[in-house]
Amino acid sequence: MAKSPDDMMSAVIGSLADRTGRTLEEWLALVDASGIDPLDQNAVRRWLRSEHGVPQNSQWAIADAAARAAGWVRPTVEEYVDAQYTGAKAALRPIYDALAEAITALGNDVSVEGRGGYTPFVRARQFAAVAPAARDRVDLGLRFTDPPASGRLQPSNGPGQATHKIALRSVADVDAEVQHLVRVAYDQNG
């Protein structure tokens, strides 16, 4: 089973001193002294990279810890999903809901994670991701090690870790073929 994002963050934090020469507490003091808004995690990561050459995973861990210290609370999966399907994209939510139901029904080893722009579904590794791509389209990203033949699959490098994607414009598009392709991705990533 894949490590949770919190487990991975803890592992990165545990190795910060070895990887960067500073502990998390030392990095948080530097971020605080820099004058950068700790709630702007992108700005903190840019500063860590440009000024200190901090590796990417360490940037994420430090920026996350700085934001949490400033009062930020990570949204729940449902809050991330709600934010993705608001405004002009609110009409796409039923497509997401149909996909999420089909994907999570594959097994109790499927976990759903929250992201700002897409929703990943993970088994041993991410095998599916759902993203509101346009006002009238949801992209279903699937990760294959051996892609099946299907005219609906488009080679892709997103959303998430997808090797292929399918454009969906209605709940009716979440049909038997799409569910079969999701099952193949699930089976190949367990």
List where the protein language model places each region.
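Charge-dense, helix-prone N-terminal extensions
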Residues: 1-190
